[in-house]
C-alpha cells in the first residue's frame, strides 16, 4: 500500500466537472435556508454568486495563493450544517474565489488518472480544520489521545515546541512486524535550506510524525549537521556584531550600536540553544537508543541522502514566446529513495510519500504536483512485479478554502439530542470539540479528491461509499487481517468506524486484463507550462446574480455529461416517517438483511426546513436503527440525506391527510434493483394518491386508498 497525501483541494474544485461523479449535475443537491440551491452562495454585501471556472493556462490563478482554511473559518463556512456562509467565511479580495473550479482542460492528467482507475466522490477530509490535524488522522487516527485531551484542531497546536506523544499507526505496524517507511526528499526541521531550496526540497511540514516525541526528529543527520555548522560559525558572527556596535557607538550612532548589540544578543541566545541541543542529540546519545527507537526514527524520516544533489537546485531555462524565462528546479531526484526501493523490489508493506511544497498541489505554490503524482505512478507501474501487488492511494488532506457542495456528515454532541443521535453504544465525546473560540464537531470535514490506483481498481469507476483519512488506516488493517496479522488503530473512534469505510468496496478481481494508464508527464515541460502562467492576467469571477438569474442558471453544464461504472456498495438504508400526535417520528435504519456481515453502517444529515433550517446529525451502526421526532406545525418539511445521494423528504401540514409512506427494496434478500412503496392510510377518509417518478421517467400512477388500508 502506497499513500500519497497532497494538499488543499476540494472535490468540486478539482473533480466537480468530471463525468459520472456527484459534481455539478447532482440531482439532489442541498437546499440553503433561503431556498436557493447550494451552488448559489451569498456574500456579506448580499450579492449571490455561482461556481465558475478558473482557467489555469489562460490566467495566473495558480500563482495567486489560496483562501482561509483554519478551524474557525471551516466551522463558520459549515454554519452548523446550514452551509450558507462560504463567501463570508472564505473572503479573498472581494471576489467569490472560493467558488472557483477547474475542469479537464486545466487538469488533464488528473482526469486521465480518474478515468483509468477509481475516483471516490464521497471521500471527506477527517476534520473541519487545516493541514496538520487532518494529517494527524492519516497517521494516527485522531487529533488527541482521548476525549479528555486537548483537541489539536489548529495547525499550531502540534509543532516542534508542542509535540504530541500518543501512539501512531506506524508504531503499531512496527510492533506487529510489518514493514513501513515514510519517504520525503528532506524533512522540515531546520537543516539549513533557505527560500526556494526549502520550497522545492523539504517536506513542507507535511510529515506530522516530525512532531511526535517518540520519533526523536532532532537526531536527523541533516539537522545535526546544521547545528554543527551554526555552533562553529556563530561565535564569529557574534564577535563581528559586537565590534560593529563598538564602532557605531564611537561614531556617535547610538541607535545603530543598540541594534547591533540586540542582534548579537539574539545570536548568543541561538548559540546557547544550539549547544544545549547538541548535548542531548549527538552520536553518543543516539547510540544509547534502543534498536526499536532507532528504527522508528530511520523509517519515519527516510530522505534522499543517496542522491548527491538532493539538497541542490539548478536553473531551468525555456522560451515563452519571444521571452526567455528561468525558474529554479531540483537538481537531484526528489523521489530517489522511493524509486530505488521500487526498482529493487524493496518497497515496504506500507509506504507514505510526502512531497515538497512546490510539488504538493498546495495553492501557496504553483500547481506542479501533477508531475509528482504522474512520476509516482510511473515508478510503480514500470516494475510489473511491484505493480501486480500494489495499491496506490492519492488523497488530499483538506479543501483549503475551496467550496464543495456536499455537506459533510458530522458527529452529534453526546447528551445533546437537539444535535442528533447515534446507535446505542457509540460515544462521540472524542469527536466533538470546544476550542479556539468555536464549538463544533471535529469532523468529518469537506469532500476532497481520492483516487485509488491498482490492478483491482482499474477501469474508470466511481465509488460512493463514505470515506475519510482513517479509511486508509482501515484498509491496511483489513489487508493485514487477511494475512493473519491483527493490527488495529485504537485511536479511531467508534463513530468514525461506523460512518467511514475501509476502501475495500473499491476493489474487484483482476484477471490480467490490459490497463490503459495515463501518459507520464515530463517534469520540465510541466514546470515550464505552469511557470509561464505566472505572467498571464489575473482570473476573473462570475458576476453577481439576480433572483431571475438564479432561477434560470444551470450549473449542470459545468460538468461533463454521461455516467461511469459505479462500485456496488453494501448499504441497505431505510428511512421512514409517520405522524404521531403533534410529532413526525422518523426512523433511520441500516439493515443487514441482504449483505449480512458485510453490511455498512451509515451517517445521515437531518434538515428541518420549517424551523429556519435546523440540522441534526445521525450515525446508525449496521443492523440497528435510530429514531428521532420533529414537531409538526401548520407546515413541516424534514429532509434526511445519507451516503451516495440517498435522500428522503417528508413535507406537509397539520391539517393534511395522515398517510404513511414506506419505501424499501423489492426482492427481499435478492434485491432486483427496484424499490417497493407501501402506503398506509391512517386518516378517517379515503385518499387519492399520486406516485410521481421525478428521476427515471416511469409513468405517473394514481391510487385510491381507503381509510385504514
Please provide the spans of the model-predicted regions.
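N-terminal pro-sequences and low-complexity stem/linker regions of secreted or lumenal proteins
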Residues: 1-709
Amino acid at each position: 500500500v502506497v499513500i500519497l497525501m497532497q494538499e488543499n483541494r476540494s472535490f468540486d474544485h478539482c473533480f466537480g466537472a468530471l463525468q459520472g461523479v456527484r459534481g455539478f449535475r447532482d440531482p439532489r443537491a442541498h437546499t440553503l435556508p433561503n431556498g436557493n440551491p447550494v451552488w448559489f452562495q451569498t456574500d456579506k454585501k448580499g450579492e449571490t454568486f455561482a461556481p465558475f471556472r478558473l482557467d489555469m493556462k489562460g490566467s495566473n490563478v495558480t500563482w495567486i495563493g489560496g483562501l482561509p482554511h483554519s478551524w474557525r473559518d471551516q466551522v463558520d463556512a459549515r454554519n452548523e450544517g446550514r452551509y450558507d456562509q462560504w463567501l463570508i467565511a472564505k473572503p479573498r479580495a472581494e471576489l467569490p474565489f472560493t467558488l472557483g473550479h477547474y475542469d479537464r482542460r486545466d487538469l488533464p492528467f488528473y482526469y486521465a488518472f480518474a478515468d483509468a482507475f477509481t475516483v471516490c466522490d464521497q471521500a471527506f477530509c477527517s476534520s473541519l480544520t487545516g493541514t496538520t490535524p487532518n494529517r494527524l488522522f492519516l497517521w494516527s487516527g485522531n487529533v488527541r489521545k482521548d476525549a479528555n485531551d486537548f483537541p489539536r484542531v489548529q495547525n499550531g497546536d502540534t509543532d516542534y515546541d508542542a509535540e504530541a506523544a500518543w501512539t501512531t499507526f506506524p508504531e503499531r505496524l512496527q510492533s506487529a512486524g510489518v514493514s513501513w517507511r515514510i519517504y520525503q526528499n528532506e524533512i522540515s526541521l531546520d537543516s539549513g535550506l533557505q527560500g526556494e531550496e526549502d520550497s522545492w526540497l523539504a517536506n513542507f511540514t507535511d510529515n506530522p510524525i516530525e512532531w511526535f516525541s517518540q520519533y526523536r526528529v532532532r537526531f536527523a543527520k541533516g539537522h545535526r549537521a546544521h547545528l554543527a555548522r551554526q555552533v562553529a560559525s556563530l561565535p564569529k558572527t557574534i564577535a563581528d556584531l559586537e565590534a560593529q556596535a563598538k564602532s557605531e557607538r564611537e561614531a556617535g550612532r547610538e541607535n545603530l550600536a543598540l541594534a547591533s548589540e540586540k542582534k548579537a544578543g539574539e545570536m548568543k541566545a541561538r548559540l546557547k540553544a544550539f549547544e544545549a541541543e547538541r548535548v542531548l542529540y549527538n552520536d553518543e546519545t543516539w547510540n544509547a537508543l534502543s534498536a526499536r527507537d532507532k528504527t522508528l526514527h530511520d523509517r519515519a524520516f527516510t530522505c534522499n541522502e543517496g542522491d548527491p544533489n538532493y539538497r541542490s537546485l539548478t536553473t531551468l531555462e525555456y522560451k515563452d514566446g519571444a521571452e526567455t524565462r528561468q525558474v529554479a528546479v531540483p537538481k537531484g531526484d526528489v523521489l530517489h529513495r522511493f524509486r530505488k526501493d521500487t526498482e529493487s523490489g524493496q518497497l515496504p508493506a506500507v509506504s507514505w510519500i510526502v512531497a515538497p511544497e512546490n510539488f504538493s498541489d498546495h495553492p501557496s505554490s504553483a500547481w506542479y504536483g501533477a508531475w509528482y503524482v504522474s512520476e509516482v505512478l510511473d515508478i510503480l507501474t514500470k516494475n510489473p512485479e511491484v505493480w501486480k501487488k500494489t495499491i496506490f492511494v492519492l488523497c488530499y488532506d483538506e479543501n483549503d478554502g475551496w467550496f464543495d457542495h456536499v455537506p459533510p456528515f458530522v458527529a452529534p454532541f453526546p447528551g445533546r439530542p437537539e444535535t442528533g443521535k447515534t446507535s446505542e453504544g457509540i460515544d462521540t465525546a472524542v469527536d466533538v470539540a470546544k476550542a479556539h473560540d468555536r464549538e463544533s464537531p471535529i469532523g468529518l470535514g469537506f469532500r476532497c479528491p481520492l483516487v485509488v490506483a491498482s490492478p483491482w481498481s482499474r477501469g474508470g469507476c466511481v465509488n460512493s461509499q463514505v470515506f475519510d483519512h482513517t479509511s486508509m488506516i482501515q484498509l491496511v488493517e483489513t489487508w493485514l487481517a487477511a494475512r493473519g496479522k491483527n493490527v488495529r488503530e485504537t485511536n479511531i473512534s467508534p463513530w468514525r468506524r461506523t460512518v467511514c469505510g475501509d476502501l475495500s468496496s473499491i476493489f474487484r478481481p483482476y484477471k490480467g486484463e490490459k490497463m490503459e494508464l495515463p501518459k507520464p508527464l515530463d517534469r520540465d515541460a510541466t514546470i515550464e507550462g505552469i511557470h509561464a502562467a505566472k505572467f498571464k492576467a489575473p482570473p476573473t469571477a462570475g458576476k453577481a446574480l439576480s433572483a431571475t438569474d438564479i432561477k434560470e442558471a444551470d450549473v449542470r453544464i459545468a460538468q461533463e455529461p454521461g455516467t461511469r461504472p459505479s462500485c456496488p456498495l453494501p448499504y441497505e438504508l431505510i428511512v421512514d416517517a409517520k405522524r404521531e400526535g403533534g410529532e413526525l417520528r422518523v426512523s433511520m435504519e441500516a439493515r443487514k438483511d441482504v449483505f449480512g456481515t458485510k453490511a455498512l453502517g451509515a451517517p445521515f444529515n437531518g434538515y428541518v426546513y420549517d424551523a429556519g433550517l435546523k440540522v441534526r446529525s445521525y450515525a446508525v451502526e449496521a443492523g440497528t436503527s435510530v429514531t428521532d421526532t420533529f414537531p409538526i406545525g401548520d407546515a413541516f418539511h424534514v429532509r434526511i440525506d445519507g451516503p451516495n445521494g440517498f435522500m428522503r423528504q417528508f413535507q406537509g401540514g397539520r391539517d393534511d391527510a395522515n398517510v404513511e409512506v414506506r419505501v424499501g427494496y423489492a426482492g427481499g434478500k435478492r434485491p432486483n434493483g427496484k424499490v417497493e412503496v407501501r402506503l398506509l392510510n391512517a386518516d378517517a377518509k379515503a385518499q387519492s394518491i399520486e406516485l410521481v417518478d421525478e428521476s427515471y421517467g416511469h409513468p405517473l400512477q394514481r391510487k385510491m386508498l381507503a381509510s385504514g388500508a
